[in-house]
């Protein structure tokens, strides 16, 4: 039996997911409930084709940019358990969307401890660090 929820390694063990800093992945947000698996964590698996691995705090500028490039994150979509985001919400964002926003100067700040390590296959740690959110 293999796991498909992003936590398994196929042999029955469930290793704790790691973040981009190499430590245990921390929860991104429970309100709104985020993550591909809607468990608050930016973890991923084979069924997460968008790779929702970057924990961000969205801004109005980012939300406008995302809508302009065809990904409306502001409008609620209850059929996908998606509440619609507003400025200040934390959310597990697709790594390619974050990279695109960064290239256009509108990347939202990230919570490094809550970004899944697999994001580093697409973006550089230094780029994430340059946009790191200082938590209170």
Predicted regions and their residues:
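Extended boundary segments
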Residues: 2-61, 132-134
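Short, basic/aromatic beta-hairpin or loop at an interaction surface
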Residues: 57-72
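Exposed, flexible binding/inhibitory loops of compact, secreted disulfide-stabilized domains
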Residues: 57-59, 100, 126-127
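Short, compositionally biased
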Residues: 98-121
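Glycine- and charge-enriched low-complexity intrinsically disordered segments
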Residues: 116-136
